[in-house]
């Protein structure tokens, strides 16, 4: 099974020991990005994974591609040009929320890439699944054009497209949420799988009164989507955090059991859910097991340092089966 993801590769800068940036002279970095995080998870689940993106033609780009290969993700379709990679810093602890600070992201090699930089037909020759990150629709007009063309050609070739909304208002302040909704409506007819929140779906459908079950079933019918999936989070009075997943497909609507979260590093946990849903869907699991596998994958991603999903199917299945093991020997 071959899976391609289109999206931006980022460099995440982290301050050690949860300090403020003003308190340190040191930074750690991780090569990350929604597509890469999902692919690393699917690679660990046993699939062949390929990244479609553009990196700077310098040592930063070389280091990034080396990190991509280290995760087992193939870089055959990565192109090079320009001299800048998108940067962001993000750290928080306890009641102090993490803050994401983007550094000149819209001028990165990826954001300045053009359709002619990619041989899309060649990239799709042996692909079974394509994932397109919704952030690609929020950046520059040229990147949006690439995402739409990739979705269209994949659809025409019978390759299933999975798409997530992943809205980030701070990425491009000049574009409103309504602008983005109109662009999402252009790509949805090509999509087989959709990852979305209750808010996202209601905005697309221009409704505000339905629950997630009704909303997901409506958007599935409206755009002839095979599977709609997402997570639901809540807090209790003690500030404990909980998560569960949902899917809506041809078999009906299903929710997972709820997990109390132990959070080591939340960034990338949603990508862990996407990887889990795609894997269990491709493995033809029962609908009840698809959503349980997906949310278990996300729960484990909360316990992993860094954005990239690194857990195995064994890890996920043990959690699904409620096997409490402190040490694997």
How does the language model describe each region?
Residues 238, 253-323, 327-329:
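Conserved post-catalytic alpha-helical subdomain immediately downstream of the catalytic base
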Residues 20-39:
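Short catalytic helix/loop segments, enriched in acidic residues and glycine
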Residues 154-160, 223-226:
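A short helix->loop->beta-strand "cap" motif at the edges of active sites that frequently abuts
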Residues 1-20:
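Positively charged, low-complexity intrinsically disordered leader regions
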Residues 33-44, 147-153:
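Histidine-anchored nucleotide/phosphate-binding helix
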Residues 48-134, 316-329:
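Conserved N-terminal subdomain of the carbohydrate kinase-like
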Residues 146-157, 182-190:
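Catalytic-core regions built around general acid/base machinery
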């Amino acid at each position: 099974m071959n899976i391609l993801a289109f999206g931006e590769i980022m460099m995440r800068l982290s301050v050690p020991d949860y300090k403020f940036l003003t308190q340190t002279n040191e930074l750690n970095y991780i090569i990350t990005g929604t597509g890469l995080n999902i692919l690393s998870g699917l690679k660990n689940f046993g699939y062949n994974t390929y990244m479609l993106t553009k990196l700077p033609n310098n040592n930063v780009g070389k280091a990034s591609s080396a990190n991509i290969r280290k995760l087992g993700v193939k870089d055959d379709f990565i192109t090079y040009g320009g001299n800048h990679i998108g940067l962001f810093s993000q750290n928080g602890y306890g009641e102090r929320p993490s803050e994401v600070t983007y550094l000149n992201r819209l001028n990165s090699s990826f954001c300045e890439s053009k359709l002619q930089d990619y041989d899309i037909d060649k990239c799709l020759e042996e692909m079974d699944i394509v994932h397109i990150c919704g952030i690609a629709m929020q950046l520059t007009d040229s990147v949006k054009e690439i995402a739409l063309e990739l979705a269209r050609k994949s659809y025409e070739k019978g390759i299933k497209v999975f798409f997530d909304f992943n809205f980030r208002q701070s990425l491009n302040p000049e574009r409103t949420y309504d602008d983005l909704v109109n662009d999402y409506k252009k790509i949805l007819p090509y999509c087989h799988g959709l990852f979305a929140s209750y808010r996202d779906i209601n905005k697309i459908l221009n409704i505000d009164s339905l629950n997630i079950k009704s909303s997901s079933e409506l958007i599935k019918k409206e755009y002839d989507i095979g599977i709609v999936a997402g997570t639901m989070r809540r807090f209790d009075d003690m500030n404990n955090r909980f998560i569960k997943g949902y899917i809506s497909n041809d078999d009906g609507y299903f929710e997972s059991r709820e997990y109390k979260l132990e959070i080591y590093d939340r960034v990338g946990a949603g990508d862990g859910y996407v990887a889990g849903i795609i894997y269990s869907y491709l493995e033809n699991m029962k609908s009840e097991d698809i959503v349980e596998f997906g949310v278990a994958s996300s729960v484990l991603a909360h316990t992993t340092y860094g954005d990239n999903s690194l857990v195995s199917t064994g890890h996920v299945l043990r959690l699904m089966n409620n096997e409490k093991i402190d040490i694997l020997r």
